[in-house]
Regions:
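Hydrophobic alpha-helical context, especially transmembrane and signal-peptide helices
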Residues: 10-12, 16-17, 41, 200
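N-terminal secretory signal peptides that target proteins for export/translocation
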Residues: 1-12
């Protein structure tokens, strides 16, 4: 979702480091113009894998009464704030991100598919997702009733569009970093989350809490984990030039 956005101090430092390495013939091994041919494993760098766990009590799902468009939405909506695999304690829908240390090199450029938000049976699908700044988001209404997609970032409206039944999808570029709260003003119980980063070093946990992040530059980096109910936790990890780093983190 490319768009004009103010360059952060970290991004400016990275840019200056790139310029200096080109001028002095430094170690810009990641540059396709300067680097010698590499194998696929060398070019992607190390892999960070792990699991996000939760061993605490899991609250029972909440049942909400539906008082509008119940023929499509149903008479009740089930809201489950935590999804935990009983066998492994793996936590689903946690977003894991590697915060690069300043001066560790530029963010890797990757091709990304459009981020899709679907209004289906009066729910946003997916409920949680992560994306990169500049990615395209495509919003669909699959229901025979009108919806409204209202995206809020830092208490400001980033997007507010009506989604008529049978209408064309809305296509926009993500231009704001951070946590995006997605709501429907027509059906107040509809809510979802998008987390937008300025680099591709992120992943979302599976049903068993697993994640995998590739191509991270070597160095001491901070891994941050976000969950809609449990909040944020962090851990500093030393990433080698190659190989696999295993990081398991647990919400208490």
């Amino acid at each position: 979702m490319a768009g004009c956005h103010r360059m952060s101090a970290q991004a400016l430092v990275r840019l200056l480091m790139v310029a200096m390495s080109v001028v002095v013939g430094g170690l810009a091994d990641w540059s396709p113009l300067l680097a010698a041919p590499q194998s696929s494993s060398e070019s992607t760098g190390p892999v960070i894998v792990g699991r996000i766990l939760y061993r605490g009590p899991v609250p029972a799902p909440t049942q909400l009464q539906v008082n509008r468009d119940s023929d499509v939405c149903g008479t009740t909506i089930t809201i489950a704030s935590l999804s935990v695999d009983v066998a492994t304690h793996g936590l689903r829908n946690a977003v894991v991100h590697v915060d690069l240390a300043i001066g560790e090199g530029p963010a890797r450029t990757v091709e990304s598919s459009p981020a899709v938000v679907r209004n289906t049976q009066c729910r946003f699908h997916p409920h949680v997702a992560a994306a990169q700044i500049g990615d395209e988001v495509q919003i669909f209404n699959d229901d025979p009733v009108m919806h409204n997609t209202n995206i809020i970032v830092e208490n400001s409206t980033a997007l507010n569009v009506a989604m008529v039944a049978g209408g064309n999808p809305i296509k926009k570029r993500l231009k704001k970093l951070g946590l995006h709260l997605v709501k429907c003003n027509v059906h107040k119980f509809m809510q979802a989350y998008r987390v937008v980063f300025d680099d591709p070093y992120f992943d979302q946990t599976t049903e068993t809490g697993q994640f995998s992040i590739t191509g991270v530059p070597p160095g001491l980096h901070r891994i941050s984990v976000w969950h809609e109910t449990l909040g944020v936790m962090e851990k500093d990890v030393q990433v080698p030039a190659r190989g696999t780093v295993v990081v398991d983190l647990e919400y208490k």
